[in-house]
Amino acid sequence: MQIDKNGIIKSAQLHDKDVGSIQVQVSLLTSQIKQLTDHLLANKKDFISKRGLYAKVSKRKRLLKYLKHNDLEAYRNLVKTLNLRG
């Protein structure tokens, strides 16, 4: 199962050339986390992927914390859009 990276970027970008903003990074990480979660449900003993999942969750958590501290409105919109707890 491949991630539609361009579609995710287009849905989260702030302007036409935006590919690295916090919103885009969190959106990409969220899709990767969902994909890894599905993979780990089928492959319970894949500890390397589990470690990668934890790293991605940790990075997303740091980025969301940064966004919440610097732009609360953008944080709330992103959490609502991605259906994340917040």
UniProtKB/Swiss-Prot annotation:
Function recorded in the entry: One of the primary rRNA binding proteins, it binds directly to 16S rRNA where it helps nucleate assembly of the platform of the 30S subunit by binding and bridging several RNA helices of the 16S rRNA.
Oligomeric form and interacting partners: Part of the 30S ribosomal subunit. Forms a bridge to the 50S subunit in the 70S ribosome, contacting the 23S rRNA.
Keyword entries, A-Z: Ribonucleoprotein, Ribosomal protein, RNA-binding, rRNA-binding
InterPro entries, per the entry: Ribosomal_uS15 (IPR000589), Ribosomal_uS15_bac-type (IPR005290), uS15_NS1_RNA-bd_sf (IPR009068)
GO CC terms: cytosolic small ribosomal subunit
UniProt GO molecular function: rRNA binding; structural constituent of ribosome
UniProt keyword Signal, yes or no: no
UniProt family annotation: Belongs to the universal ribosomal protein uS15 family.
Cited PROSITE patterns: RIBOSOMAL_S15 (PS00362)
Originating organism: Mycoplasma pneumoniae (strain ATCC 29342 / M129 / Subtype 1)
Pfam families xref list: Ribosomal_S15
One biological process term in Gene Ontology: translation
Gene: rpsO
Annotated protein name in UniProt: Small ribosomal subunit protein uS15
